[in-house]
Design a protein with these regions (language model features):
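C-terminal motif of bacterial Sec signal peptides marking the signal peptidase cleavage site
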Residues: 18-21
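Short amphipathic, basic-aromatic surface patches that mediate peripheral association
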Residues: 84-94
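Short strand-turn-strand beta-turns centered on an Asx-Gly dipeptide
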Residues: 106-110, 164
Length: 192
């Protein structure tokens, strides 16, 4: 009888632990310091991942958006990192040319138009810290933005992303919703 009670209690505790582990609370933002340069990079706790419906080929296209902020001796720069990747075919290369790389983010009927930086910023943390997809090669771009734009994205009800110069006929819709983590990130950077 005592054994049944102990096993029943253990089962209840195990079920509660599993339920707690499966909760969808966003993870906290992280501040990463480069010991060589002194640059601090704040990174969102979870990325926003989007997918484009398959268009009849064997590949499936994805985008990962990661918000970061660089603090280079008091000079703050908010950035949106974009990884484009494809299942089955490896990295999804970006188009070449001066006009490629435009990122359109439709937020509740408003359009945010971001242009890529000419090159990735120096002093970024390692790939794991920046949520670089590890299952396949990915193409990466960086876009300058601001906290208000990040706040707008984090509080949106509808979010659609397009790369008009890359995939003119396709929109990317939410696959894994990192907007709650983005909201935490903006609050973290805005301070008390």
């Amino acid at each position: 009888m005592v054994v049944k009670c102990v096993l029943g209690g253990l089962l209840s505790v195990t079920i509660l632990a599993v339920m707690a582990a499966c909760s969808t609370l966003p993870t906290s933002p992280r501040d990463l310091v480069d010991d060589r340069t002194g640059i601090t990079v704040s990174v969102v706790g979870a990325p926003i991942e989007l997918e484009r419906e398959p268009n009849g080929v064997a590949a499936h296209d994805f985008l990962t958006l990661v918000a970061i902020q660089r603090d280079d001796d008091g000079k703050y720069t908010a950035l949106m990192l974009l990884y484009r990747w494809t299942v089955f075919y490896g990295g999804a290369p970006f188009g070449s040319g001066a006009d490629s790389g435009e990122l359109l983010i439709d937020v509740d009927g408003h359009q945010i138009d971001l242009q890529p930086l000419p090159q990735l910023p120096t002093g970024l943390p390692g790939p794991k810290d920046l949520f670089v997809p590890d299952m396949t090669e990915s193409a990466m771009r960086a876009y300058a933005t601001d906290l208000e734009t990040l706040r707008l994205i984090s509080t949106s009800h509808e979010l659609i992303v397009r790369l008009p110069k890359e995939t003119p006929n396709g929109s990317f819709t939410l696959w894994h919703d990192g907007r709650p983590a983005l909201g935490q990130f903006v609050n973290h950077l805005s301070g008390p």
